[in-house]
Amino acid sequence: MARSWSLLLLPFALALVASVAQAAVVEYTFNVGNLSISQLCQQEMIITAVNGQLPGPTIVATEGDTVVVHMVNESPYNMTIHWHGIFQRGTPWADGPAMVTQCPVRPGGNYTYRFNVTGQEGTLWWHSHFSFLRATVYGALIIKPRGGAKAYPFPVPDEEVVVILGEWWKTNVYDLQQRSLVTGNPAPHADAYTINGKPGDFYNCSAPNQTHKFELKQNKTYMLRIINAALNTPLFFKVANHSFNVVAADACYTKPYKTDVVVISPGQTVDALLVPDAGVAAAVGGRYYMAVIPYNSAVNAADPSFLYSLTNSTAIVEYGGGPATSPPMVPDMPEYNDTATAHRFLSNMTALVPNRVPLAVDTHMFVTVSMGDTFCGPEQTMCMPDDKGTIFASSMNNASFILPNTTSMLEAMYKGSIDGVYTRDFPDTPPIVFDYTADASDDNATLKHTFKSTKVKTLKYNSTVQMVLQNTRLVSKESHPMHLHGFNFFVLAQGFGNYNETTDPAKFNLVDPQERNTVAVPTGGWAVIRFVADNPGVWFMHCHFDAHLEFGLGMVFEVQNGPTQETSLPPPPSDLPQC
């Protein structure tokens, strides 16, 4: 019997050895420095970029590979790189958020990021995690299946196309963020949106070289790897005379989801097969606009033109083989405030196969995600308070997060010396219960006013956490893209209004919920997520609107060590930057 089992297992053992043998070390060098660009009426704009590119270089790896990136900071600013969506199991020092897992790399310095991509495949991305520099310091991170394209659980595309959506300011984004901090006023909206770094045809001073072109061939299947790298804006994405078959989100496969519009919040990714309407694929020389517009989810806020640029960003999808004889077709876009379309897209996707959702929950959290106010701080040397003496702030459970300034939180955890760095008292619930989404709730000064702190929630290794994320109307109701470092989570349910702990659990999808690293909490609503804390370290959870993060919309999970060396924090690398 033992011999027959050995024979049966031999092919599997050989396959495992072959898989391990095929794993590679994928190595890149990122030179971060100044780049001069002429765009939108500006003869010369100096931005911070990687390897002189906007977007930066695409990292391509295969599942199981080790990725090594040598980052050389030739810019005038501090710098870190975050590998958005990478679990960093065993490599928490490579996660990248400044003052959370590392001190930033100073100008003239360098740091080598090393991490493994085992158990992950799909579209992720990388970006700066210091100040507003990720406005131009970003790029795609593609993880291919170990079995190649034939291993895709959907029709194999003939080609794959990276589409990175971004925002563009006609000013230095570092100065923009510093001005926002010292005055206490949120930064103004972007001057333009971009597709692969270019704004398109519809802006003033647009030039032909400022519109990205995708040259396609007839009767070929294309998969778009769509990334929202914008600082502060959810986007509607369409291609005229085409629809999409969504097959993955945040590098997790989904059941095929057919739609004519993709809705994507900052931090999120979507993989979609591009489906031409009848006759399009055969139209030699056919030209179609790819377009994005902002999704304005804010309710009871300022005029949308104050919050967002309302001009479409465009690229051109062109079918070759003949002359372009007509202007590109323009897609019909949703209204800016079309929350119904946004919610339909963001909530209807499900996992491709049933997930192993943990049923027993160890830690329950109910967390309000709020805009509010606070008093001017000593660092805000040009503070401009309102008539009540307060300035804009944001918070989770009324705690407005600030980063430490002496050492990183991960170093403090590793050394066991957290005093003066952070405290272990992030609350599981808000200080009071009230009608979170009612218009009258803005009179509730208890929760609207917040205080700055660096609080973490400590979790036992391998514990299961369920978090209800509840939007509030203290200032305005708005969809917030909440991103968790170090983990994926299951999105069990989403809805509008106040979460009801008695009736809403009946809506939980415990069979095939979508798996994400960034969830867009519905405007004036809630989302329930669940994850297993099996990755020791300190892991940032925050709104992926940088305009909200800088004013405190974040918190940190401290996951304790497990029982073995493999489930405990490793020592820091020798080249870890020092503060």
From Swiss-Prot:
Location in or out of the cell: Secreted, Extracellular space, Apoplast
Glycosylation sites: 34, 78, 110, 116, 204, 209, 219, 241, 312, 337, 348, 398, 405, 444, 462, 500
Coiled coil: none
Native species: Oryza sativa subsp. japonica (Rice)
Family designation: Belongs to the multicopper oxidase family.
Cofactors named for this entry: Cu cation
UniProt protein name: Laccase-24
Record GO terms (molecular function): copper ion binding; hydroquinone:oxygen oxidoreductase activity; oxidoreductase activity
Its biological purpose: Lignin degradation and detoxification of lignin-derived products.
Source species, domain of life: Eukaryota
Residues involved in Cu cation 3 binding: 129, 485, 542
Residues that coordinate or bind Cu cation 4: 480, 543, 548
Signal peptide stretch: 1-23
PANTHER family documented for this protein: LACCASE-24 (PTHR11709:SF439), MULTI-COPPER OXIDASE (PTHR11709)
